[in-house]
């Protein structure tokens, strides 16, 4: 049996972390979560992930700072920004700092799963 892809969800919204975790586990992924940017950085330092789903606006350390850390220290980890602030400026900043894609909240599960599968296969 193939090893499951490991995904880290970094978002300060409790409900979103819970629901998205459940949906992604149901889709066959191994999931870990972090409630803010600092927790997200700690998780990436301590465990191997294939993909990080990353909110932008969070307490302690915002998503762009986490993205910069990941791309500098763990460039093999893919990142999809998942944010309620889906404007052109944030999309451009995300790409500038190395995110593979950008998905707005509220997300459509089928679209998000398609994006995750595409990014993981690249």
PLM region spans:
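Two-component/phosphorelay signaling modules centered on CheY-like receiver
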Residues: 14-32
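Acidic catalytic/metal-coordinating carboxylates
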Residues: 36-39, 62-65
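Active-site beta3 strand of CheY-like receiver
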Residues: 47-53
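Receiver (REC) domain active-site loop signature in two-component systems and cognate sites
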Residues: 58
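Short, conserved "switch-loop" micro-motifs in signal-transduction and mechanochemical regulators
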Residues: 85-86, 97
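Short, glycine/charged-rich "phosphate-handling" switch motifs in NTP-dependent
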Residues: 100
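C-terminal output helix
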Residues: 107-117
């Amino acid at each position: 049996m193939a090893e499951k892809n490991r995904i880290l969800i970094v978002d300060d919204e409790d409900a979103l972390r819970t629901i998205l975790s459940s949906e992604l586990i149901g889709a066959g992924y191994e999931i870990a979560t972090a409630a803010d940017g600092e927790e997200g950085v700690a998780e990436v330092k301590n465990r191997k992930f294939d993909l990080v789903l990353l909110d932008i606006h969070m307490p302690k350390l915002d998503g762009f700072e986490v993205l910069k850390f990941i791309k500098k220290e763990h460039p093999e980890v893919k990142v999809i920004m998942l944010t309620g602030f889906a404007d052109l400026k944030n999309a451009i900043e995300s790409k500038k700092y190395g995110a593979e894609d950008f998905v707005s909240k509220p997300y459509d599960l089928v679209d998000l799963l398609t994006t995750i599968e595409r990014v993981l296969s690249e």
